Amino acid sequence: MWSLLLLAALVGQGFALKNVFDMRIQCPHSANFGETSVSGYTELPPLSLQEAEQLVPESSCNMDNHQSLSTINKLTKVVWRKKANQESANQNSFEVVESEVSFKGLCMLKHRMVEESYRNRRSVICYDLACNSTFCKPTVYMIVPKHACNMMKSCLIGLVPYRIQVVYERTYCTTGILTEGKCFVPDKAVVSALKRGMYAIASIETICFFIHQKGNTYKIVTAITSAMGSKCNNTDTKVQGYYICIIGGNSAPVYAPAGEDFRAMEVFSGIITSPHGEDHDLPAEEIATYQISGQIEAKIPHTVSSKNLKLIAFAGIPSYSSTSILAASEDGRFIFSPGLFPNLNQSVCDNNALPLIWRGLIDLTGYYEAVHPCNVFCVLSGPGASCEAFSEGGIFNITSPMCLVSKQNRFRAAEQQISFICQRVDMDIIVYCNGQKKTILTKTLVMASAFILLQVSFHCYQGLPIAIAIELCVPGFHGWATAALLITFCFGWVLIPACTLAILLVLKFFANILHTSNQENRFKAILRKIKEEFEKTKGSMGCEICKYECETLKELKAHNLSCVQGECPYCFTHCEPTETATQAHYKVCQATHRFREDLKKTVTPKKYWARLYRTLNLFRYKSRCYILTMWTLLLIIESILWAASAAEIPLVPLWTDNAHGVGSVPMHRNTYELDFSFPSSSKYTYKRHLTNPVNDQQSVSLHIEIESQGIGADVHHLGHWYDARLNLKTSFHCYGACTKYQYPWHTAKCHFEKDYEYENSWACNPPDCPGVGTGCTACGLYLDQLKPVATPFRIISVRYSRKVCVQFGEEYLCKTIDMNDCFVTRHAKICIIGTVSKFSQGDTLLFLGPMEGGGIIFKHWCTSTCHFGDPGDVMGPKDKPFICPEFPGQFRKKCNFATTPICEYDGNIISGYKKVLATIDSFQSFNTSNIHFTDERIEWRDPDGMLRDHINIVISKDIDFENLAENPCKVGLQAANIEGAWGSGVGFTLTCQVSLTECPTFLTSIKACDMAICYGAESVTLSRGQNTVRITGKGGHSGSSFKCCHGKECSSTGLQASAPHLDKVNGISELENEKVYDDGAPECGVTCWFKKSGEWVMGIINGNWVVLIVLCVLLLFSLILLSILCPVRKHKKS
């Protein structure tokens, strides 16, 4: 019993889950002005016609549904049926039946309903029906004010027996509509449509609802007649009203027709040309069969005397809406026609209707929202890192190969923020955001954990550990050197004697071992010499009885006396006088070394090792003089090592450099040449002083700057590439003559039809067809669910260029050179010898989203005679008609006895876009940065360095040192501001105010330096007057005072950067890190090291004197501890 109840409960839950469907509403994340609403819809599975007539939508959303939708609406229901007399097959073999039916919640919107729902914060939830004679497929629509996006994340709509979960998805768009992965903002002005070259064009899905409203301004049939150029009469007495539309699921209401709004004009044109709009096919219904009964007329409403509406009766899967409104009456006669296609063709004047709901694509002019760069930062969180990315506009794409990037979005005004977790920090974190590669140096995060521990230790004074603990947390040798320096200063007076004592104990241990080993080896050598002399003079030293080899003469005599008597010569124990017995006894005898020890006592040992051991014992490791000497010496050595280890972090990417030369180059050779290659993303700066080989005091400054590679492509904008679903419909007719009917899919943008006429037997006729040999079949192919997915550009020509500037003394020249081109001046020649590239003429660049995110290179893109499934199969060119693909497959009509014929198509049924997505990894991709584009040209830079340039620089020897040695340009420096941190991998940015006098333009470099080392440089072209220069550097220490330097001259004052590891760690853009600076400056030597150490000590004293007091207190404590543990020895008076 209970098991059956449990089973029933589980089955009921499974059925409930099966009947839950999603409706996703896309919301831009920034509020805009106007009555903006968002909308969505969802297709539901079929239910019986009787159940469909009883549907009532219910909502659990916190916005109440509009009251007017709960009222009962009356429609004229038109159904068809076979006549009782089926003797002959003709157009009169079936008939229609009209009646009145009531619905509650059907999409029959009232005038000002959407506007009122916006002001009153109410929702509009309704449904539409696509029906045949037996069942209906509901489509639920929802329109809500944009405020709902901020108030709710999801809610439920009930439409018995279905439940629809409404999910509000915040897009990265600020106010625009998400299409092709980009944010499009339509422009309603007609002038923008007339000047299409100045605006972008996008295909946007639009949903329109007919509003019946009487009035002279709502004569919609008159507008249709005027738009189509037909000559219909009595339009004033026909239906009146308008369509209210929501564009792209996110817009203020658009009213059609409206002559002053281009959006309304496009919507109205779409309704007239394709009145059925998109079909309502569910997945797997793209291949279906219709049985067409034929054309028939009906009376709307059923009480009128004459028939006033034409319809086409069918049986099969319903694909289009069954609701419409009669065009011939101004009273608003609504129609519900299950199993019938109403005549929506507006080219005829009578017996037609207007669609009640229309859904389709329209082409609109407008602009795309700008894509802003991302900022990424991370903080330490447990064993990993907690990161956050934010952008001023929105984030269209964010991925990371080492992080779990979730979609935890937060929005603040127009800014979008995404939080995610990185589980590992043992390697640098790489994040791709908005087409940019960001690198977070995790060694800074690892330092933070140690720093936090130290900061907790000094909880009573939080500022104390800043200047010292951060130096300890620097990875590598510098951190260990800092620790050794601090330990020596604070506890050296205790640790030095303790370490010395430990060393002495170890030395004495080894000295004792060496002494013992040496004495043993010396004694063995004496015994060997004694034995050799005895054997030379008297013979063998072996006992004749026991055959034992003796070491001394005394031992041999004892053997001769005892072995004869059967006694042991060592312990005098009785044993049998045989060789075997005595040898066995000697192995266990404890006194065999007796004669050896007696001889060892007579040998005098050497005193060398004894003197060494005694010296170690007498060493005065407790002496204050010794401790002071070692303490001072260690502090000096450790300070030098500490300063040497705090070198700058070079900003050098991976590149091949064959250049030869140093900071100062004497011009002995005929020419001075550099030859190297480096990535396209790198910027190169080369600076040297060229000296006169005759007079070293005469020199000329040479400064060469080569910008990163720019790629410019002349392109042809091919338009928009569409994804689509291919439908195969079989339409069979067996009532009356074989007529070529106008089916709803004939208004699709891309369709093709193959007709088969009369059959000669029952082989293909279903049993419900009256007569024999009657029937014709139409096989229709058409594309629906068109969706723009990408933007392709065909490359006409491509150019790779770099801007090269040369400052030679006073001479300043610049030129942009292409590959295999040279820049020649009087003294220098700079050439790009070759470029390794992956772009070529004729390639197609495909952008699947914002162009800032990069694209895909297609070597084979279809431009003419395209087949469905090829790349570029369904295209919407700009300012040209829609291009449909060809369908090269063959049709086959499959016949079985007494069944409806079925069309078969053996061609490809998968769109080109879906094929590309399935094999996208096989295509070559590229990234972009600093992209600028029009319909005719695209310019960008390669952020990945995938391309390489071979550069050759030749400097002539013919230099007039007499005239060029004097440079009149005067540069003044002042440090204005600093951001960032010292000593970290992220670095700092120093803002310098640089003044230039005596010359109009000067190309030079400004460095960020402290007293000892320069940590970064920026090549800049100065103009006369004040210039602002921002320099990025990495390195330094807590005492570094960063100044702006030009050559050997620096600003009078410097600025100190923040301590690292205290704030969040920001990501570094690859573009900011891809630069090579080479000025041949000498490396930091011993003098430089001492300056650096002194600067650090002075920085500690000036910046945080409490630290110095604490260090001195620790030093005093170690001295007291020394006096307790190692008191001074008192000398007794003689």
From Swiss-Prot:
Question: According to the UniProt record, where is the region Binding to the ribonucleoprotein?
Answer: 514-531, 586-603, 590-601, 609-623, 1121-1134
Per the record, its GO cellular-component terms are: host cell endoplasmic reticulum membrane; host cell Golgi membrane; host cell mitochondrion; host cell surface; membrane; virion membrane
Annotated spans, Fusion loop: 756-776
Q: Which domain of life is it from?
A: Viruses
UniProt-listed InterPro entries: Envelope_glycoprot_Hantavirus, Gc_C_bunya, Gn-B_hanta, Hanta_Gc_N, Hanta_Gn-H, ITAM_motif_hantavir-typ
- Sorted alphabetically, which Gene3D superfamilies does this protein's record hold? 1.10.8.1320
Q: Where is this site: Cleavage?
A: A646, A647
Sorted keywords for this record are: Disulfide bond, Fusion of virus membrane with host endosomal membrane, Fusion of virus membrane with host membrane, Glycoprotein, Host endoplasmic reticulum, Host Golgi apparatus, Host membrane, Host mitochondrion, Host-virus interaction, Inhibition of host innate immune response by virus, Inhibition of host RLR pathway by virus, Inhibition of host TRAFs by virus, Membrane, Metal-binding, Phosphoprotein, Repeat, Signal, Transmembrane, Transmembrane helix, Viral attachment to host cell, Viral immunoevasion, Viral penetration into host cytoplasm, Virion, Virus entry into host cell, Zinc, Zinc-finger
Q: Where is this motif: YxxL?
A: 613-616
Chain ranges sitting on the Cytoplasmic side read 505-626, 1126-1134
| Entry annotated with the keyword rRNA processing | no
User: Is this entry keyworded RNA-binding?
Assistant: no
Glycosylation site list? N132, N233, N345, N397, N927
State which residue ranges cross the membrane: 485-504, 627-647, 1106-1125
| Disulfide partners | C27-C149, C61-C155, C107-C126, C131-C136, C173-C183, C208-C245, C232-C349, C374-C433, C378-C387, C403-C422, C734-C769, C738-C776, C750-C884, C764-C895, C779-C903, C805-C814, C822-C831, C862-C866, C969-C999, C992-C1044, C1009-C1014, C1045-C1050, C1084-C1088
ITAM domain residues:
609-632
Q: Where is the signal peptide?
A: 1-16
Q: Belongs to which family?
A: Belongs to the hantavirus envelope glycoprotein family.
Q: What is this protein called?
A: Envelopment polyprotein
